[in-house]
Amino acid sequence: MQQRRPVRRALLSVSDKAGIVEFAQALSARGVELLSTGGTARLLAEKGLPVTEVSDYTGFPEMMDGRVKTLHPKVHGGILGRRGQDDAIMEEHQIQPIDMVVVNLYPFAQTVAREGCSLEDAVENIDIGGPTMVRSAAKNHKDVAIVVKSSDYDAIIKEMDDNEGSLTLATRFDLAIKAFEHTAAYDSMIANYFGSMVPAYHGESKEAAGRFPRTLNLNFIKKQDMRYGENSHQQAAFYIEENVKEASVATATQVQGKALSYNNIADTDAALECVKEFAEPACVIVKHANPCGVAIGNSILDAYDRAYKTDPTSAFGGIIAFNRELDAETAQAIISRQFVEVIIAPSASEEALKITAAKQNVRVLTCGQWGERVPGLDFKRVNGGLLVQDRDLGMVGAEELRVVTQRQPTEQELRDALFCWKVAKFVKSNAIVYAKNNMTIGIGAGQMSRVYSAKIAGIKAADEGLEVKGSSMASDAFFPFRDGIDAAAAAGVTCVIQPGGSIRDDEVIAAADEHGIAMLFTDMRHFRH
């Protein structure tokens, strides 16, 4: 599979010029003739490199404000010409073979992401000549190397040095695959953007435009193959976005432990996204994609101790997420106390990693610190289709709550209500969360009946000897009947936070008043399926 091809002539035309001068210098130093266009040619000439403008090579000038510059037979014939088969016709038409094409495309995604981007701006940033050259070179990878990523520059020069100025077929094939992936992603962005504008062109409201395109094109890059999927008979892999804009499990670096499983990744995502909701030092422990213990504290050790107390049994073999650096004291507490599958935090101290290294199977991930949450899309696969929605980034503050009962909540009840409301957002529906003094004391998850979730939360608290009296309870959706309030009151809950919106709200509020419970309406639901 060697089939080496020497690189004697290269065409360089890039929008992102990072590293291009150094790459061109390396090519030129190895005797490669340089062809280039527009701004790339000017930059290389300014750096003293011998470069031929494509317009001089073709004898045809750039025109139409640069719209037409590489669409010429002398360019595409040089790229597509099959060595040993098309030599005679290339010589007849004075077409020189081009052995390498270095191209990246107009910044369409960056253009349309700018506030106030007009349709005209978007149109002018649709690259035509670039993708055409990329596809031509990729098609003829048997003879031509196509380079679309600056991260490949160094490896290409090294291989040329190792092969007397040549590249192997295996390398050219790999570069061709990257090229087709690159143009596919580029065309997908364009199709998605214009597809989302179809409603406006049909006279529909502005709100209807810019939401979801009529054809959804998705591009994800494989990060790793999994040993198996959710179950051992299922094959699986982990794919990530090319440009992840927020610290996440997709951006995380594994600094210790055996390979992550499918379920590890799913559970780690659930834990990390939950802990991001808190500004104070916080810990979230997750089992089977549900929080089983959450707390905030004076330190992450304090938060971990309190989160663990919610449900030590379920915490065994769980995933632990922090919103502060993992320190040695906390690492020691975890390793001494329980078996843990994954620990994820923005960072981990060297001392902490020395401690966790004693348990080689423990996976430790660092994801970097996060800032503002980034809007995006959530997907749910159904047989034959895909459900798409905005990420649930909704959250209410104290000033947005409505007190609907006779009794007002105390300051501590209010703090606990807001705390458990944040947790309930990440618990599978029907979700009920009991909290007291900024820690969960009982969680009822995934029940078909809301009242049973409330009962389970109370049972969990009782099993761990945690006092429910004076606690707050969050429900991810409204109570359809008063029975959930009666169950909470029986357990000792004194404050309830819920969306409201049931046709029996009056009945539910009356039940709260009967029990002396303060009730807050959020007017926002957090179903999670």
UniProtKB/Swiss-Prot annotation:
Keywords for this protein: Acetylation, Hydrolase, Multifunctional enzyme, Purine biosynthesis, Transferase
N6-acetyllysine modifications at: K287
EC code(s) of this entry: 2.1.2.3, 3.5.4.10
InterPro entries, per the entry: AICAR_Tfase_dup_dom_sf (IPR024051), Cytidine_deaminase-like (IPR016193), MGS-like_dom (IPR011607), MGS-like_dom_sf (IPR036914), PurH-like (IPR002695)
CDD domains: IMPCH (cd01421)
GO terms of molecular function: IMP cyclohydrolase activity; phosphoribosylaminoimidazolecarboxamide formyltransferase activity
GO biological process assignments: 'de novo' IMP biosynthetic process
Pathway linked to the protein: Purine metabolism; IMP biosynthesis via de novo pathway; 5-formamido-1-(5-phospho-D-ribosyl)imidazole-4-carboxamide from 5-amino-1-(5-phospho-D-ribosyl)imidazole-4-carboxamide (10-formyl THF route): step 1/1; Purine metabolism; IMP biosynthesis via de novo pathway; IMP from 5-formamido-1-(5-phospho-D-ribosyl)imidazole-4-carboxamide: step 1/1
Reaction(s) this enzyme catalyzes, per UniProt: (6R)-10-formyltetrahydrofolate + 5-amino-1-(5-phospho-beta-D-ribosyl)imidazole-4-carboxamide = 5-formamido-1-(5-phospho-D-ribosyl)imidazole-4-carboxamide + (6S)-5,6,7,8-tetrahydrofolate; IMP + H2O = 5-formamido-1-(5-phospho-D-ribosyl)imidazole-4-carboxamide
Domain MGS-like: 1-148
Alphabetical list of SUPFAM superfamilies matching this protein: Cytidine deaminase-like, Methylglyoxal synthase-like
Top-level taxon of origin: Bacteria
Keyword Aminoacyl-tRNA synthetase in record: no
One term under GO cellular component: cytosol
Comment field on protein domains: The IMP cyclohydrolase activity resides in the N-terminal region.
Family membership: Belongs to the PurH family.
Designated name of the protein: Bifunctional purine biosynthesis protein PurH
GN (gene name): purH
